[in-house]
UniProtKB/Swiss-Prot annotation:
Major localization class: cytoplasm
Cellular localization per UniProt: Cytoplasm; Membrane
UniProt-recorded name of the protein: Transmembrane protein 196
InterPro entries hit by this protein: TMEM196
Recorded topology in the membrane: Multi-pass membrane protein
Keyword Transmembrane helix among record annotations: yes
GO BP annotations, alphabetical order: negative regulation of canonical Wnt signaling pathway; negative regulation of cell growth; negative regulation of cell migration; negative regulation of cell population proliferation; positive regulation of apoptotic process
Job description of the protein: Acts as a tumor suppressor in lung cancer. Inhibits tumor cell growth by inhibiting cell proliferation and migration and promoting cell apoptosis. Inhibits metastasis of lung cancer by suppressing beta-catenin expression in the Wnt/beta-catenin signaling pathway.
Alphabetically ordered keywords of this record: Cytoplasm, Membrane, Transmembrane, Transmembrane helix, Tumor suppressor
Amino acid sequence: MCTSGQIIGSLLVLSVLEIGLGVSSVAVGAVSFSLALREHTPQLGDSSPFLLCGICGILCAKKKSGLVMILFSACCICGLIGGILNFQFLRAVTKKTSSLYPLHLASMSLACIGIGGCTVSSWLTCRLASYEQRRMFSEREHSLHHSHEMAEKEVTDNMSNGAPQLIFNGRVQSMF
């Protein structure tokens, strides 16, 4: 079983990968846009949700709060959907004879890698949330057990008043 540190480390690596994919996708989209303007063909833009997903992943790994994990999961799902739609759109309009074919192929490759990264990031976020939930439950249980022990000790200290007493089945009984 993975520890929290291993999950967070993996999440950070994937988030940096997603940021890299996002920046690369934006660069490929910009080159594609400039070439499309010269050829008077419609631009097949690559709006990259992976950049936002990567930034939220780094925030999630640092904060580890429930709301940030939910935000990151939502970004991963949006990145997944955006990557699938982008891939399908590019696959449908790409022609091998087009001068933009290498850029479309690069965009489709980045989308596939981004889809895989978003899928693994979503899974890791669920693992991290599960780990944090178990940790919080354990802390609460320990705190409750400790406060119960302290309350029991306080009761016995208050009732002793210097006279010897016995405790039977949780009840304090004076010997005199």
